Each structure stands twice: as structure tokens, then as C-alpha cells.
């Protein structure tokens, strides 16, 4: 600059970014666990099925919550809260290839790809797209229905599309 100080182009350190994400997730989940413990709420992680009006059988899990441990137990309760979470849909026609990732895998990529194809114009895929666009990836979206974010207010979707149009090279609707 004019004063003799130049700043280079911004650079993203994906490893540090991922580390920060993990810290935030750890704080959030740790905070929820602490609040539950403080209120004497028993938490169980696993796949459950009600076996009575006040009993649930749980097959416990570990890690990300999807790996079954083989341990089952029946939990008695007066009141039950189910925090179901979510799991990405496996598309049977997709090849088993490290370049194909779901939303969980997209949050763990080692580097920012130059180009990405997002299958599905739903909220989660578009959210991932806006993140990777901000990090420098070029994006295309394929959606088999006639509009993005099905189920969302159409007027809001139009505003979102207008505000984010430059993030996406192509949005292909009614496309399989």
C-alpha cells in the first residue's frame, strides 16, 4: 500500500478451520451433557425401541453415534426425550469412491476442491455449497424436482437464489 505495508491474498488453512469446528462441536455437546447431568437427566446413546409405556430398549452406539456396540439395555423412565439426530441418505447408484461425500464427509475434507457437484437442492446441500463457495470452490447443483429447497416458502427461496446466484455456476432443475 501507500504506507509501505502490503497484505497478501487471504488464505484458508483447512486443518485449522476443521480443528475450530471440532472445538465448537465439543463445547456444544459438552454443554448439553453438563446441563442434562445438572438436571439429573439420564442420557443414553443408541438405537431405541419402546417396549412398554415407560420402557425403551436401547442398542448402544459409540463414536459418531452410528457404530453399534452390541450392548443392549432396557431403560425405565417417567418422561422420555428423543433427540433423533440425522443420518445422510445413501444413494444406491453412487459409486463407492472417496470423491463422493455426504454432508458429514464434506465437513471433514482435507482440502477445498476446485469444483463440486451437489446432488440435491435441499437446505443441507446448499448450505455446504455456500461454505465451499466461500472457500473458493466452483459449484454446480443438480435437483430432480422443479425448485430448490422444497417445502420452504417459495418467496424466501427466490430471495435466497437471487442473493446466492453468483456462488453457483449451474443450477440444473428437473434433472436426474
Where are these regions (language model features)?
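Rossmann-like NAD(P)H-binding beta-loop-alpha module
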Residues: 110-152
Amino acid at each position: 500500500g501507500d504506507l509501505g505495508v502490503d497484505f497478501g491474498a487471504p488464505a484458508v488453512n483447512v486443518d485449522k478451520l476443521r480443528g475450530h469446528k471440532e472445538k465448537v462441536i465439543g463445547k456444544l455437546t459438552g454443554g448439553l451433557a453438563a446441563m442434562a447431568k445438572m438436571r439429573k437427566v439420564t442420557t443414553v446413546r443408541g438405537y431405541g425401541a419402546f417396549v412398554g409405556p415407560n420402557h425403551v430398549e436401547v442398542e448402544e452406539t459409540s463414536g459418531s453415534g452410528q457404530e453399534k456396540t452390541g450392548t443392549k439395555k432396557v431403560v425405565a423412565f417417567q418422561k422420555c426425550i428423543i433427540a433423533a439426530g440425522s443420518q445422510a441418505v445413501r444413494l444406491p447408484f453412487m459409486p463407492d469412491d472417496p470423491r463422493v461425500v455426504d454432508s458429514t464427509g464434506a465437513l471433514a475434507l482435507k482440502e477445498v476442491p476446485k469444483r463440486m457437484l451437489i446432488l440435491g437442492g435441499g437446505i443441507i446441500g446448499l448450505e455446504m455449497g455456500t461454505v465451499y463457495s466461500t472457500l473458493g470452490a466452483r459449484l454446480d447443483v443438480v435437483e430432480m424436482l422443479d425448485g430448490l429447497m422444497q417445502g420452504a416458502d417459495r418467496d424466501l427461496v427466490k430471495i435466497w437464489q437471487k442473493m446466492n446466484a453468483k456462488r453457483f455456476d449451474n443450477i440444473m432443475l428437473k434433472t436426474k
